[in-house]
Swiss-Prot record:
Name assigned to this protein: Toxin BmKaTx16
Known tissue expression: Expressed by the venom gland.
Localization terms from the record: Secreted
Record domain LCN-type CS-alpha/beta: where: 21-83
Removed propeptide positions: 84
GO terms of biological process kind: defense response
Entry remark concerning the domains of this protein: Has the structural arrangement of an alpha-helix connected to antiparallel beta-sheets by disulfide bonds (CS-alpha/beta).
Species assigned in the record: Olivierus martensii
Keywords: Disulfide bond, Ion channel impairing toxin, Neurotoxin, Secreted, Signal, Toxin, Voltage-gated sodium channel impairing toxin
Gene Ontology molecular-function annotations: sodium channel inhibitor activity; toxin activity
Tagged with keyword Disulfide bond: yes
Amino acid sequence: MNYLVMISFALLLMTGVESVRDAYIAKPHNCVYECARNEYCNDLCTKNGAKSGYCQWVGKYGNGCWCKELPDNVPIRVPGKCHR
């Protein structure tokens, strides 16, 4: 029984687990992508692997693109300054 658990755990680690999150997609230097239209953000987000995206009006970082189910390998806006 222990061997079965260990083999299952090893297979899980070998295949990897990719998680997703909802967040503002970030440009280099921790800046959001400014927006005016939902279509722009949806295109940007889906091209980067997200399920969808929209323009978050007057949000925490102004008018920025918010992505739903964005992969972990894509940078997101984190607390702190945008260094343009």
